[in-house]
Amino acid sequence: MDSDDDMHDMDSVDYDYYSGGTYDDNDSDETDFGFGEADTDDAAIIASYRSKSNYVVLKEEDIRRHQNDDVGRVSAVLSITDVEASTLLLHYHWSVSKVNDEWFADEERVRRTVGILEGPVVTTPDGREFTCGICFDSYTLEEIVSVSCGHPFCATCWTGYISTTINDGPGCLMLKCPDPSCPAAIGRDMIDKLASKEDKEKYYRYFLRSYVEVNREMKWCPAPGCEHAIDFAGGTESYDVSCLCSHSFCWNCTEEAHRPVDCDTVGKWILKNSAESENMNWILANSKPCPKCKRPIEKNHGCMHMTCTPPCKFEFCWLCLNAWTEHGERTGGFYACNRYEAAKQEGLYDEAERRREMAKNSLERYTHYYERWASNQVSRQKAMGDLQKMQSEKLGKLSDIQCTPESQLKFIAEAWLQIIECRRVLKWTYAYGYYLQDHAKKPFFEYLQGEAESGLERLHKCVEKDIEVFELAEGPSEEFNHFRTKLTGLTSITKTFFENLVKALENGLADVDSQAASSKPANSKPSSKTKGGGKGKGSSKNGGSSRNPDGN
């Protein structure tokens, strides 16, 4: 455990984690908390709280509007129908500039490649009856349907063909004429005309999703059931985004938001949490293989006399793994094994014991970090539930009791949102700590982590416990304004501290390196004098560090 002196030294490291945040009980109550006046919806509040200029959350109607705008632009510039423009954009992955460049470079080649034909490729036979190219039945002209190529098929076969391809998946967006040798594209007009209502919904679902899935700057929100997309502009170091559904995730890897940990570390941590490797570590640390059948056996009683499970039933000594029949008073009796102790002194069991001890230590270390990682996740989920309960049940009552409009109580929601965000950050600091290889940085990291936990607990207590006296009051209290100032102050300080903590961890705790580097001249002074046998001109110049605690 770190001494008090160590803690003081770490606290003196030249990094202002509290810069920008002040707490004063006498601060003015006229504070703008950054929320709208009327919108109390959870999603809107979270979106407002986490909104950043480097991304935009798109609803389905927004995506559809973007699609229609692109289709209209291509249609106007190339003087083609909207259906043909849609077909071109699908082929060129919704790139308007690519469509224009390719079209004006070689229109004929583009038409041939995409399947937008200028005229029929087959001659319509004279007569009142036509033969369907799929079922080969005869139909009148009114019952025959064809696209730009002119191949005749009956409406029933067309419907079946379209339905089959739509139910096969997104490939239906590149649908071609049923004739195997024909490249003619089938556009949205045929879907509207011949597909069933259910098939139309599926087709346009694929059509909508194609706009996002081919765009490198857009991704769907990975939350189950969410139908929003994120348009990410970049330009910042953070990939964390928040959807209107309140789900926060990393735009780069689509895992949950995980600052200050990088995506590679998150991938390793998640894999470790779900992999069988930890089960094997537990088995290795807490069991030994049966000397006869080699199955792992856990020792669950105090006696060293072990009996393997049927059908093996081999009896052996837990310490030396030899047959129990060889044990008696000469080997130490039932609860000790002189043979094992002697062999251990000779080094015969050192390797196996060392492996088992290493596995046990590794498991204990992993368990330490995982339990705290998971605990903060549970606390975060509970805080989200408490926020929802506060907004749906308690806020109105508190407004009535304190005679304060709900629009002036948004500071409470802001505090809860800060707690939710801090729990997320604190949770991932444990994954950061697990993979932190530089042992010199560990004490400072754990100090910062401890300070973060302490500050967060103060904020959590204030918004969860201290508010109860005002919720249970019979009328307005003069102390409520003091509570408002206290809570907003704690929220601001906690936010600033966690923001600086994230930056410090993302920079690899560079301040520890800089502190070590700046202390090297002072530390090297004694050795310089020893080597030189006295104060030379150079040693005198280098020895006058202001960081020397003796002041020499």
From Swiss-Prot:
Zn(2+) 1 binds at C132, C135, C154, C157. Its EC number is 2.3.2.31. Residues 514-530 have a biased composition (Low complexity). Zn(2+) 5 binds at C290, C293, C308, C312. Pathway: Protein modification; protein ubiquitination. A zinc finger (RING-type) spans 132-182, 290-320. It catalyses: [E2 ubiquitin-conjugating enzyme]-S-ubiquitinyl-L-cysteine + [acceptor protein]-L-lysine = [E2 ubiquitin-conjugating enzyme]-L-cysteine + [acceptor protein]-N(6)-ubiquitinyl-L-lysine. A zinc finger (IBR-type) spans 201-263. Binds 4 Zn(2+) ions per subunit. Zn(2+) 4 binds at C250, C253, H258, C263. The active site is at C303. Zn(2+) 6 binds at C317, C320, H327, C337. CDD domains: BRcat_RBR_ANKIB1, Rcat_RBR_ARI7-like, RING-HC_ARI6-like. Residues 513-552 are annotated as: Disordered. Zn(2+) 2 binds at C149, H151, C177, C182. Residues 128-341 are annotated as: TRIAD supradomain. Keywords: Metal-binding, Repeat, Transferase, Ubl conjugation pathway, Zinc, Zinc-finger. Zn(2+) 3 binds at C221, C226, C243, C245. Signal peptide: none annotated. Ubiquitous. Members of the RBR family are atypical E3 ligases. They interact with the E2 conjugating enzyme UBE2L3 and function like HECT-type E3 enzymes: they bind E2s via the first RING-type zinc finger, but require an obligate trans-thiolation step during the ubiquitin transfer, requiring a conserved active site Cys residue in the second RING-type zinc finger. The active site probably forms a thioester intermediate with ubiquitin taken from the active-site cysteine of the E2 before ultimately transferring it to a Lys residue on the substrate. Belongs to the RBR family. Ariadne subfamily. Might act as an E3 ubiquitin-protein ligase, or as part of E3 complex, which accepts ubiquitin from specific E2 ubiquitin-conjugating enzymes and then transfers it to substrates. This is Probable E3 ubiquitin-protein ligase ARI5. It comes from Arabidopsis thaliana (Mouse-ear cress).
